[in-house]
Amino acid sequence: MALSDPIGDMLTRIRNGQRARKSSVMAPASTMRANVLDVLIREGYIRGYEKVDVRKGIAELRVELKYHEGEPVIREIARVSTPGRRVYSKIKDLPKVYNGLGISILSTPRGVMSDHEARQANVGGEVLCRVF
């Protein structure tokens, strides 16, 4: 069965895994999902991920979740732009998540990056999700 929102599915798996106190979760592999996970690693929200071959030609990403003193590092992770409603933001209109304590993940012409990196690069794009 094809997913209508693969990034939203991965974010939901991460959210559910952290609420269930899992050490890792699995999600189908894709380049865009890996790019989003790279941003989460750079910003310190997950420990890491690895690509695992489940069957011949089918790969999944094992996402290692991160906890601080037994509590999930990710308190909130939510999809902003969906396939039915794309949300784009110019750099000057990019809102801060929880007054700068959280991040937004953007898909820009220069690649997938956090809102901090987008401000430094002076580039806007599609707001994929927000993390706190």
Swiss-Prot record:
Q: Which SUPFAM superfamilies match?
A: Ribosomal protein S8
Among Pfam families, the record links this protein to: Ribosomal_S8 (PF00410)
Q: Could you tell me the Gene Ontology terms of the biological process aspect for this record?
A: translation
Q: What S-S linkages are listed for this chain? A: none
Q: Which InterPro entries match?
A: Ribosomal_uS8 (IPR000630), Ribosomal_uS8_CS (IPR047863), Ribosomal_uS8_sf (IPR035987)
Keyword RNA-binding annotated: yes
Keyword RNA-binding set for record: yes
Q: GO CC terms on record? A: ribonucleoprotein complex; ribosome
What are the alphabetically sorted keywords of the record?
Ribonucleoprotein, Ribosomal protein, RNA-binding, rRNA-binding
Superkingdom: Bacteria
Q: Which GO terms describe its molecular function?
A: rRNA binding; structural constituent of ribosome
What's this protein's family per the entry? Belongs to the universal ribosomal protein uS8 family.
Q: How does it assemble?
A: Part of the 30S ribosomal subunit. Contacts proteins S5 and S12.
PANTHER family to which the protein is assigned, alphabetical: 40S RIBOSOMAL PROTEIN S15A
Its biological purpose is as follows: One of the primary rRNA binding proteins, it binds directly to 16S rRNA central domain where it helps coordinate assembly of the platform of the 30S subunit.
Q: What is this protein called?
A: Small ribosomal subunit protein uS8
Give the organism the record lists. Rhodospirillum rubrum (strain ATCC 11170 / ATH 1.1.1 / DSM 467 / LMG 4362 / NCIMB 8255 / S1)
Gene behind this chain?
Answer: rpsH
